[in-house]
Amino acid sequence: MQCLKSAWRVMMILPILTSSFVLADDHMLNGMNVQQPFNLQANLCKLNPGVSLEDYHAMVEDYLAWAETNDVDPVFVRQFPLFSHQTLQRPWPYDFVEFLASDYERWGKSWDLWLTSKSGMALNERWQELAVCDVKQAHSQVLYANREALESDDERYVTWNWCTPKVGFEQLSQKHAQYVAELTNNPTGMIGWAVVFPHTGAANMPGEFAHLAVYPDMESFMTRRKSEATGGWRGQREYEQNYADCTGEQLNIETVLHRP
């Protein structure tokens, strides 16, 4: 039954991902064709005792050099929670989360090299000495993008909002297309919007897919909140009443560490 449920989720969500929403004149963003779904790896990491972030980052820099040499380097970002859902009773078990975005074939090649080449295995061993990281894989697609802002801004803010659909993919896709048209006309501070659908290792996520919204600064984030407070909440309420149940947004600080 669980396998059938997972298969249904894939059949419903993937058409949403493959709908044409983004970048009408140029579908390339950070070296990837974001008109199509791409792979997004999440590393949820906690540093080992005595290891500093500087120690860990030195390994990441060596990894990126290795990945560039082997022509498998991803878009690489790191996020820290700013406004999270966690409490003293439910603390976040990680120090940070990293996201590595790449097309599927390139990422498969990267993992083959990581697991079988001498240099890849050495880096993997070093990685595991520095931190414990739970690794997850997901489908993702950008639905709205201010390309210039996204490719030039290395320090930004990202909200995550996990949702579970109430309707079929046609209705959800149409609603997302309507939302993209509204963003294109008036982004109210947002420079990017994407959806993420886990495909491997993420059975315990808080929803079946996530909305990601990207902001260049906190002023832009609060501009969006003002828009919601002055009437935009009606659209959010309609979405959650009729299209999907969502957990609510969490805001993370994001640093872009590498672009291919």
What are these language model-derived features?
Residues M1-M11:
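Bacterial N-terminal signal peptides that target proteins for export
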Residues V10-S19:
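Bacterial N-terminal signal peptides
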Residues L23-P260:
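Short S/T/G/P-rich N-terminal loop/turn motif that feeds into the first structured element of a domain
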